[in-house]
């Protein structure tokens, strides 16, 4: 059995954006106050959690929301963790210009 593995990502998103964006991974949007979701992956799971941080002000004009989003993998191999992380990153990727 694989020991739990946790990774953290500093992200710029609100709780509402997190709840909406995670929907393709969970099969539906999270409820209004939910800050984490457990996602079944093969014979294991991933707990994805949102932890808000103070926003940062850019150029005195714009406040950017910040949060630590953690992924805690239970019972997954390195290959499975890598595949899920790639899917997570793609799901949360935003267009730039």
Can you name each region flagged by the protein language model?
Residues 55-76:
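Intrinsically disordered, low-complexity regulatory segments enriched in Ser/Thr/Pro
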Residues 26-29, 88-96:
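A common structural junction motif
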Residues 1-5, 33-35, 52:
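Structured alpha/beta or helical-core interaction and ligand-binding surfaces enriched in interleaved
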Residues 40, 47, 68-70:
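Beta-strand secondary-structure signal
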Residues 15-20, 77-83:
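Short, conserved charged micro-motifs
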Residues 43-61:
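A short, structured beta-strand/loop element
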Residues 25-37:
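Short secondary-structure junctions
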Residues 1-25:
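Terminal, regulation- and interaction-focused segments at domain boundaries
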């Amino acid at each position: 059995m694989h020991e739990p593995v946790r990774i953290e990502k500093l992200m710029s998103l609100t709780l509402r954006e997190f709840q909406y964006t995670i929907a393709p991974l969970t099969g539906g949007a999270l409820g209004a106050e939910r800050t984490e979701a457990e996602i079944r992956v093969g014979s294991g799971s991933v707990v994805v959690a949102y932890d808000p941080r103070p926003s940062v002000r850019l150029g005195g004009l714009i406040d950017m929301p910040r949060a630590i989003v953690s992924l805690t993998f239970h019972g997954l191999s390195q290959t499975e963790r890598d595949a899920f992380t790639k899917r997570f990153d793609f799901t949360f990727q935003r267009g730039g210009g």
